[in-house]
Amino acid sequence: MDQEQERNISRLWRAFKTVKEMVRDRGYFITQEEIDLSLEDFKAKYCDSMGKPQRKMMSFQSNPTEESIEKFPEMGSLWVEFCDEASVGVKTMKNFVVHITEKNFQTGIFIYQSGITPSANKILPTAAPAVIETFPEASLVVNITHHELVPKHIRLSEAEKKELLKRYRLKESQLPRIQRMDPVALYLGLKRGEVIKIIRKSETSGRYASYRICL
């Protein structure tokens, strides 16, 4: 196996670990063992005898934890798929959407290598009420939420959001905003109208919280 292939496998392994962490951070059940998968075990499990990654085998389903269902009763199961094809066309995306809708997944996460054609992107809304999210592999090689400058973000339930607005006598329009395309919003799968609590460290008061609404 040449160095370039080794590098690519290492990047894919890191992206796979980030996806597992992302799914866990959204409140789905992922074991620590899955996240701690070593590079050697990853190769043994997901690469063929020639050392070529078999991305289809990396796909997985995850269900919400009991704690998540208590906080977000409407939360459903999720399906993650890594695409074998370098460029994603209409047929591949149609198959993915059919899988998500037929199996009644609430969320489908589609990880692609280099690009999705505009025609394929137009198919995504047809999965409604399910939500399809797409991520390029390269964006997942590093988990952005692990960066020391990125504070902890926690998604609030509808009840927590109402309590927050009531406590501070605020309207939704008065809350600071976070864009839906913000990297952390994408990581957490935030939807319009949802509020996140951001916990930052402070030199004077230890920790303090601020809130943002997703638009």
UniProtKB/Swiss-Prot annotation:
Cite the InterPro entries for this sequence. Arch_Rpo5/euc_Rpb5, RNA_pol_Rpb5_N, RNA_pol_Rpb5_N_sf, RNA_pol_subH/Rpb5_C, RNA_pol_subH/Rpb5_CS, RPB5-like_sf
Q: Which UniProt keywords apply?
A: DNA-directed RNA polymerase, Nucleus, Transcription
Kindly indicate whether the keyword Transport belongs to this entry.
no
| Taxonomic superkingdom | Eukaryota
SUPFAM superfamilies assigned to the protein according to its UniProt record, in alphabetical order? Eukaryotic RPB5 N-terminal domain, RPB5-like RNA polymerase subunit
Q: Does the keyword Nucleus apply?
A: yes
- What role does it play? DNA-dependent RNA polymerase catalyzes the transcription of DNA into RNA using the four ribonucleoside triphosphates as substrates. Common component of RNA polymerases I, II and III which synthesize ribosomal RNA precursors, mRNA precursors and many functional non-coding RNAs, and small RNAs, such as 5S rRNA and tRNAs, respectively. Pol II is the central component of the basal RNA polymerase II transcription machinery. Pols are composed of mobile elements that move relative to each other.
Q: Which protein, by its recorded name, is this? A: DNA-directed RNA polymerases I, II, and III subunit RPABC1
Main location per the UniProt record:
nucleus
Q: Which family does it belong to?
A: Belongs to the archaeal Rpo5/eukaryotic RPB5 RNA polymerase subunit family.
Q: Name one GO molecular function term.
A: DNA binding
Its BP terms in the Gene Ontology are: transcription by RNA polymerase II; transcription elongation by RNA polymerase I; tRNA transcription by RNA polymerase III
Where found?
A: Nucleus
What Pfam families does the record tag this protein with? RNA_pol_Rpb5_C, RNA_pol_Rpb5_N
Name of the coding gene: RPB5
Q: One GO term of the cellular component aspect?
A: RNA polymerase II, core complex
Source organism of the structure = Kluyveromyces lactis (strain ATCC 8585 / CBS 2359 / DSM 70799 / NBRC 1267 / NRRL Y-1140 / WM37) (Yeast)
Instruction: Relate the assembly described in the record.
Output: Component of the RNA polymerase I (Pol I), RNA polymerase II (Pol II) and RNA polymerase III (Pol III) complexes consisting of at least 14, 12 and 17 subunits, respectively.
